């Protein structure tokens, strides 16, 4: 395996790093109390990846089993206990645990512990997941079945 083609051709490098302080307010807050922090978006990484900090409140929550056709999704647990479904069984993950789900891989995640929990979500390649997170937070209750199906399809979420 070799390195990918060069993405920067300059001779001396450039100042281009980004910084986001830990105490930055979340971009999305769900009615459940869960929050999403946009650490790196597809737009800010030139489509390479997206990275988000997901913070669960103590109420049970999380999506049911699904898969993505165009993106992989990885989970790195920061705090608490997060249940992750790997397509065969539920795994109780704890801080430091890592789960990678390739494109097409069946997965789900939930916090059922009654305590707050947090994790990093990494999507590769980058995709506009912000629209998905924000659409869910706004609520899909007013959408017809066809509109809801189109929303999920547009955001590469395929439910089982």
Enumerate the predicted regions with their spans.
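A short glycine-rich, His/Asp/Glu-containing loop-to-beta-strand
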Residues: 25-65, 71-72
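Long, hydrophobic/aromatic N-terminal blocks
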Residues: 1-39
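Acidic/histidine-enriched, glycine/proline-rich intrinsically disordered or flexible terminal extensions
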Residues: 132-160
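Glycine- and acidic-residue-biased ligand/ion/polar-headgroup-sensing regions
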Residues: 70-82, 87
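Hydrophobic small-molecule pocket/channel-lining residues, especially in calycin-type beta-barrels
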Residues: 61, 68, 82, 108, ...
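A hydrophobic/aromatic-rich effector-binding and dimerization subdomain
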Residues: 3-12, 122-141
């Amino acid at each position: 395996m070799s390195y990918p083609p060069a993405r920067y051709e300059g001779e001396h490098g450039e100042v281009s790093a980004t910084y986001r302080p830990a105490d930055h307010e979340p971009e999305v807050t769900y009615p459940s109390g869960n929050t999403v922090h946009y650490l790196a978006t597809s737009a800010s990484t030139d489509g390479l990846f997206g990275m988000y900090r997901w913070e669960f409140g103590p109420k049970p929550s999380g999506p049911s089993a699904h898969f993505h056709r165009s993106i992989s999704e990885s989970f790195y647990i920061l705090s608490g206990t997060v249940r992750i479904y790997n397509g065969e069984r539920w795994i109780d993950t704890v801080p430091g645990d890592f789960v990678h789900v390739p494109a097409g891989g069946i997965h789900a995640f939930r916090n059922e512990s009654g305590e707050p929990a947090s994790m990093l979500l990494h999507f590769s390649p980058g995709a506009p997941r912000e629209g998905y997170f924000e659409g869910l937070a706004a609520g899909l209750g007013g959408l017809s079945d066809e509109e809801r199906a189109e929303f999920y399809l547009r955001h590469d979420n395929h439910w089982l």
